[in-house]
Amino acid sequence: MSPETNHDLVARLAARLGPAGLLTAESDVAPYAVDWRRLFPGRPACVARPASTGEVAEVVRLCREAGAAIVPQGGNTGLAGGAAPDRSGTQVVLSLGRMAAIRAVDPVGLTLTAEAGCVLRTAQDAAAAVNRVLPISFAAEGSAMVGGVVATNAGGLNVVRHGMTRANVLGLEVVLADGSVVAGLRALRKDNAGYDWKQLFVGSEGTLGVITAAVLRLSARPRHVATALLAVPDPEAALRLFTLAQDELGEAIQAFELISGLSLALVARHGGPRNPLGPSPWYVLVEAASSLPALREAAEAVLGAALEQGDAQDGVLAESGQQAAGLWALREGITEAEAKEGRGVKHDVSVPIAAIPAFLAAADRALADKLPGARPNAFGHMGDGNIHYNVLATADQAGEAVNAVVHDVVEAFGGSISAEHGIGQYRAAELVRRRTPEEIALARRIKAALDPEGLLNPGKVLPL
């Protein structure tokens, strides 16, 4: 796009959106120009901030006429650089932040309809106000927006019970690359009429269309919650504990987290909350929720059995909501503690649940063999197979080399290089290396069909 075309596009966007709807000053644009991890600094032509679906469609049409690429952006909390513009100065960031309305809450049908710019926690609060739960939950829920949550198919803490975001989306409203609007906000649990097209856009990271609203599934609010932290000797014991918890607590399990001893040592070293248990090679944080009154007794039975058979060496069952929050604060403090510890190479991987102990052992061996001095730090959602196998690398160990070692092991176990964070630009080239040529060809055919000019979030998911 030439400078003249660029200038003309900015002028036309300003005329359509007004002063509140377009940012051009460098200081105003700066927060939108770089990803949350600050790995991909960009320089957009401007930031468009439409306030309605109609305005989103108009922005898309104007950008298409000018041949300008569009980078949809919500809360900009993603960890793969999927919402960051490039440095060309020609891309338009399309921020959905002004579209923040909750359009409907149905406590009987258990649905909530929210616009793309609605912050996830705001949607959770709206559900709670009618004694319901929006089960999508993760660390960035106070900043992440519904559109980005859906576009990245976000995971989080409750996937073991409620599934990924994909499983909780009933309907979508999407603006396509030509500016047309597909309105599919049907709040139906059963709808078998034709192709389920909405699932193409869930997890597409803004490369196939711009999500402007979503119908999300709610759940009944459980009356009782049981949260426990257990010290376990190894991942094999944690896996046996998971099986025990499934047998005794069944569908009440809503979180089952595996945490390395190094993780909580880092939390303690950098001023985090106190660990109520003694030092241990590994820990498990498990939470169950139910409206049945016998939940606590069942949780106590699981804890007692784990201690008796030696799969847990110590444990604490929270006596109050405040104590449960303290246990979760340990888990949530790991990322910040890692950042304070120094340079880390992060991995968001998944393998079959039963293979987690063998995967961890194999990855540790591969790192020790090929990158001596690198320190692996594993934690994550054992209950759904998702492990954040992060590596505290030495100064001379390139991130690409670390990724190659870890992803080779992931591939050997039939796993995925991205369990919940998405591909973005951080993993786009790696995705092509790790998927079959037929899978990549199919993805490119879908992209070409829905975005033939390649103007929607180019370079994300699929490399240019």
Ranges and model annotations:
Residues M1-L464:
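Noncatalytic alpha-helical scaffold of FAD-dependent oxidoreductases
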